[in-house]
C-alpha cells in the first residue's frame, strides 16, 4: 500500500504529510496507492470541508527552508484530489468555498502557479447525482410500445441494464457509508431506490409469467426470461440477472408443475447455470469468480459487496489508540469501495429507446403484493395435496388452517394510500398524455396495458364511454379498487415481535427496506414470521396469521428449492417443522383475489395453505419461530451423490410473505417508490453528467 512506515495506525496529520511527500517536484506520484485511498476514504473520518481546511492550515503554517517546496506539494495533492474525485468539488458547497479560500491565500502569498493548480472552474456539472427523482423530457415525436411478446431478449436486457446502471451510478460514497454504519435506509433514498428497482423487476417477471392463461404460454414467458438472463450475463449486469433469476425462482412460479413440464431441456439447463451462478454457496464464490473475470463495464450484485463492507466495519474499529486511524480497516474498506466507485464511472455503449425506457419504468412500478401474486399462482394451477410437485423448486409440506387471534390492528392510513394512487396516476399521465389535454387515448392505453398484467380493459376505466380516459376516471378506478381491498379487511391482529439476527439479507415488510447487518438487524413476529425494522414494527399494517407447529422436525416434508430440472435430493433437504391438518370444513369457503385492478377472481379452497419455506431462518428448530414465505433463490447441485453433500444457500432479497387463507381478501401492503423518469442527461455518458 505504500504507507511509508506508517504501520497499522496513524493520525490524520501523519497520513496527510505522508501523502504530500509522495509527490516529487514535478507533481508526479510514485506507485503508491496511499494518496488515492486517503482521498477516497477520508469521509469515513471527517468531511471534505474539514480535510481541505487541514490542508489550508498546513499550507499557511509552513515554515523553514523547504516551506515553498512543501506548499507546492500540498497544491499537487489538491490537484490530484480534484482530478480523481471531481464530483466532490461540484456538489460540496463547503469544499468549494474552502477551495476558493485556498486560492485566495495562495494569491496573497504570491504563488500564482499554486493558484492555477487548484482551479475547479472547468469541472462539469454533477447535479444529476443529487436529483433522486427527475421528470422525463416529453417527446412529441412518435410513440413506442413495449410489447413483451415482440421485444427481443437482447433489447429487453439492454434497457434493463440501462435502468440499472442509471440507478447504480447515482449511489455516492456517503450513501454506502450511511448504510454500513447505521444498518438502515433511513435518509438514504438513492440506495433505497436501487433496491426498489430490483424488487420491481423481480415482481414484474412473476406477473408476466402469471398473466398467461395456459401452461404452454407461461413456459414460453419463462423461456424468454431465461434468454433475457443469458443476455444480462453477456452484458455483465449481475444485479439485474439476480433479480430475474430470483423472480423465476420465486415460489409463485416454481410451484407451477404443469408449466415446468413444457420447458425444454436446454432452457432447464440454462436455468440451472444461472441459478448456480448467483448461489450464496462459498460466500458467492461462483459470482465472485465470474465478476472478477470480467473487465470494463459491469454492474455488481450490490448486496454482496455491501455485506463485505459491513463485515469489515464490524470486525475492525475506526480508530486505534488515541486519535489514530486504523489503516488496516481503511485499506480493507477501500478495496471494495474503490471498485464500486470506479464501476459507477464506467461508460456503456447502450443506445436505449427512451420511449421504451419510460414505459418499462412504469411497468416496474408495481402495486401487487406477494399475497396477490401467490394467490394468482394457486388460481392458475391449484394445489394437489395428494401428489408430490414435479417442479423441483417447490416444497411440499402439510398445512394447517389459520388460527385467528384476538386484537385489532389499525387500518392503513387512507391519506398515504391516496398519495400513492395520485403518484401512479400522475406518472401515467406525465408519460402518455402527450398533448397535455388531460386525456389518454385507447391507443396509448393499449401501450400501457401491454406491460401491466391484469389491468382492466379500456372500457372499464372509460366510465363515460367517450373513447378517452381522463385523470379523474383513472383516479376513481384505483380508488375504487383500493376501497374494495379495504371494505372486507376484517379484524387485524397483534404481532408478537422479537428482536432477531438474520442469516440472509431480508426485507422489512412495512417499508421494503433491507434488514442487512451482522446481528440484531430487525424484528420478527414469532407467530406469523413477519420481518421489519425496529422503527417500523408499530407501523406494520399486516394481519398476524398464526399457524400451528409440530413438536419436531422429523414430520416436515418441505425442502429448500432445488435446480429447476432436478428432483429434490434426499440427502440435501432442509426440514422445517411439520404442521397438523385442521378439522374445519372449508368447502364453503372462498378467497377473492384482487389484482392491481378492481377485477376479482374467486376460487374455492379445500383447505387453507401457507407459503413456501424460506432461508431467512436457521435450519435448526427454535420454539416460537414461524416459517416465512419469501423470495428465495434455489439451492441446487449439479450431480446427485449417495452421501450427504454440502448445502448450498442462496441470497434472499425480498421477504414479503405469501399466504392463502379462507374467507379473507388481500391486504395491500406494498410500498410505492416513484422511479426515475428523466433519461435525457443519462444518455450522454461522457458529456455533462460525467
UniProtKB/Swiss-Prot annotation:
InterPro entries: C1-like_sf, DAG/PE-bd, EF-hand-dom_pair, EF_Hand_1_Ca_BS, EF_hand_dom, PE/DAG-bd, Ras-like_GEF, Ras-like_Gua-exchang_fac_N. The keyword Zinc applies. Residues 3-125 form the N-terminal Ras-GEF domain. GO terms for molecular function: calcium ion binding; diacylglycerol binding; GTPase activator activity; guanyl-nucleotide exchange factor activity; kinase binding; small GTPase binding; zinc ion binding. Pfam families: C1_1, EF-hand_7, RasGEF. GO terms for biological process: MAPK cascade; Ras protein signal transduction; small GTPase-mediated signal transduction. GO terms for cellular component: guanyl-nucleotide exchange factor complex; perinuclear region of cytoplasm; plasma membrane. Residues 152-383 form the Ras-GEF domain. Residues 667-690 are annotated as: Disordered. PANTHER family: GUANINE NUCLEOTIDE EXCHANGE FACTOR, RAS GUANYL-RELEASING PROTEIN 3. Guanine nucleotide exchange factor (GEF) for Ras and Rap1. Belongs to the RASGRP family. This is Ras guanyl-releasing protein 3. The gene is RASGRP3.
Amino acid at each position: 500500500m505504500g504507507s511509508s512506515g506508517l504501520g497499522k495506525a496513524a493520525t490524520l496529520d501523519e497520513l496527510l504529510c505522508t501523502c504530500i511527500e509522495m509527490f516529487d517536484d514535478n507533481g508526479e506520484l510514485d506507485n503508491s496507492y496511499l494518496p488515492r485511498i486517503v482521498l477516497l476514504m477520508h469521509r469515513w473520518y471527517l468531511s471534505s470541508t474539514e480535510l481541505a481546511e487541514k490542508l489550508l492550515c498546513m499550507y499557511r503554517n509552513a515554515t523553514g527552508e523547504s516551506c515553498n517546496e512543501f506548499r507546492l506539494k500540498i497544491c499537487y495533492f489538491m490537484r490530484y484530489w480534484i482530478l480523481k474525485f471531481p464530483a466532490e468539488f461540484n456538489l460540496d458547497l463547503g469544499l468549494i468555498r474552502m477551495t476558493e479560500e485556498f486560492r485566495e491565500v495562495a494569491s496573497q502569498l504570491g504563488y500564482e502557479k499554486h493558484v492555477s493548480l487548484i482551479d475547479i472552474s472547468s469541472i462539469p456539472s454533477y447535479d444529476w447525482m443529487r436529483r433522486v427523482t427527475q421528470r422525463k423530457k416529453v417527446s412529441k415525436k412518435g410513440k413506442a410500445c413495449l410489447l413483451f411478446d415482440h421485444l427481443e431478449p437482447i433489447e429487453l436486457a439492454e434497457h434493463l441494464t440501462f435502468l440499472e446502471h442509471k440507478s447504480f451510478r447515482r449511489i455516492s460514497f456517503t450513501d454506502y457509508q450511511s448504510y454500513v454504519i447505521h444498518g438502515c435506509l433511513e435518509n438514504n433514498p438513492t440506495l433505497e431506490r436501487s433496491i426498489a428497482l430490483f424488487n420491481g423487476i423481480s415482481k414484474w417477471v412473476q406477473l408476466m409469467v402469471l398473466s398467461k392463461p395456459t401452461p404452454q404460454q407461461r413456459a414460453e414467458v419463462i423461456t424468454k426470461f431465461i434468454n433475457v438472463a443469458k443476455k444480462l450475463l453477456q452484458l455483465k449486469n449481475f444485479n439485474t440477472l439476480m433479480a430475474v433469476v430470483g423472480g423465476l425462482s420465486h415460489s409463485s412460479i416454481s410451484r407451477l408443475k404443469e408449466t415446468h413440464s413444457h420447458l425444454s431441456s436446454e432452457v432447464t439447463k440454462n436455468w440451472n447455470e444461472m441459478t448456480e451462478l448467483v448461489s450464496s454457496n462459498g460466500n458467492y464464490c461462483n459470482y465472485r469468480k465470474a465478476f472478477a473475470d470480467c473487465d470494463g463495464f459491469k454492474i455488481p450484485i450490490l448486496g454482496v459487496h455491501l455485506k463485505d463492507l459491513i463485515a469489515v466495519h464490524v470486525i475492525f474499529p475506526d480508530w486505534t489508540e488515541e486519535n489514530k486511524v486504523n489503516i488496516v480497516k481503511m485499506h480493507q474498506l477501500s478495496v471494495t469501495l474503490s471498485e464500486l466507485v470506479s464501476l459507477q464511472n464506467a461508460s456503456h455503449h447502450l443506445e436505449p429507446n427512451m420511449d421504451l425506457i419510460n414505459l418499462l419504468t412504469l411497468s416496474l412500478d408495481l402495486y401487487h403484493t406477494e399475497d396477490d401474486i401467490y394467490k394468482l399462482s394457486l388460481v392458475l394451477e391449484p394445489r394437489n395435496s395428494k401428489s408430490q410437485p414435479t417442479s423441483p423448486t417447490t416444497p411440499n409440506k402439510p398445512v394447517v388452517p389459520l388460527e385467528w387471534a384476538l386484537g385489532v390492528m389499525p387500518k392503513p392510513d387512507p391519506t398515504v394510500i391516496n398519495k400513492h394512487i395520485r403518484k401512479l396516476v400522475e406518472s401515467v399521465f406525465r408519460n402518455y398524455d402527450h398533448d397535455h389535454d388531460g386525456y389518454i387515448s385507447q391507443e396509448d392505453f393499449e401501450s400501457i396495458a401491454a406491460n401491466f398484467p391484469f389491468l382492466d380493459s379500456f372500457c372499464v376505466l372509460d366510465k363515460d364511454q367517450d373513447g378517452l380516459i381522463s385523470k379523474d376516471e383513472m383516479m376513481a378506478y384505483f380508488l375504487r379498487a383500493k376501497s374494495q381491498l379495504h371494505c372486507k379487511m376484517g379484524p387485524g391482529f397483534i404481532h408478537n415481535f422479537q428482536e432477531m439476527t438474520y442469516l440472509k439479507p431480508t426485507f422489512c415488510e412495512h417499508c421494503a427496506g433491507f434488514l442487512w447487518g451482522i446481528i440484531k438487524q430487525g424484528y420478527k413476529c414469532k407467530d406469523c414470521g413477519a420481518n421489519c425494522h425496529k422503527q417500523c414494527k408499530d407501523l406494520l399494517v399486516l394481519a398476524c396469521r398464526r399457524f400451528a407447529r409440530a413438536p419436531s422436525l422429523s414430520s416436515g416434508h418441505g425442502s429448500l428449492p432445488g435446480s429447476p430440472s432436478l428432483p429434490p435430493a434426499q440427502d440435501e433437504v432442509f426440514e422445517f417443522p411439520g404442521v397438523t391438518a385442521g378439522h374445519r370444513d372449508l368447502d364453503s369457503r372462498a378467497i377473492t383475489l384482487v389484482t392491481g385492478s378492481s377485477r376479482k377472481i374467486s376460487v374455492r379452497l379445500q383447505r387453507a395453505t401457507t407459503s413456501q419455506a424460506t432461508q431467512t431462518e436457521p435450519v435448526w428448530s427454535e420454539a416460537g419461530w414461524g416459517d416465512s414465505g419469501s423470495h428465495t433463490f434455489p439451492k441446487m447441485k449439479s450431480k446427485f451423490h449417495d452421501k450427504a453433500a454440502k448445502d448450498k444457500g442462496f441470497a434472499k432479497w425480498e421477504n414479503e410473505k405469501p399466504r392463502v387463507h379462507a374467507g379473507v381478501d388481500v391486504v395491500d401492503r406494498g410500498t410505492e417508490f416513484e422511479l426515475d423518469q428523466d433519461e435525457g442527461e443519462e444518455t450522454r455518458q461522457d458529456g455533462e453528467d460525467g
